[in-house]
């Protein structure tokens, strides 16, 4: 049990020998304005003002304020297509959305 000086909102649990961390990365760029064009369980199409390289990883915050939905996902960029004044970027979620998450996001 945590002591009185510990102000964490929830208790942290100790780990066992089998627990590990596969990776840690820094979010170093702010891509700027983004518009979601379409989304599926497995991926997303976005319009970005800056180009990003295919194969790069993006941290994407998805939200629907009306439904109180917020989720952060990692997207691997599959393709980048220049369009007038912007870039159409398609990517795959490293972990697919659930059907409930998808419908809450778009409906």
Residue ranges, per PLM feature:
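N-terminal helix initiation/capping motif
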Residues: 1-39, 106-107
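C-terminal output/interaction extensions
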Residues: 9, 21, 84-107
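Short, surface-exposed secondary-structure edge patches
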Residues: 10, 47-51
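Short conserved beta-strand and strand-loop elements enriched in small hydrophobics
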Residues: 18-25, 56-69
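Short, acidic/hydrophobic/Gly-rich beta-strand patch recurrent on exposed beta strands
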Residues: 35-37, 45-47, 89-94
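A residue-level detector for short acidic-glycine micro-motifs
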Residues: 38, 76-79, 95
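Short, conserved beta-turn/loop elements at beta-strand boundaries and strand-helix junctions
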Residues: 41, 80-85
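Beta-strand residues that line the small-molecule/cofactor-binding core
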Residues: 72
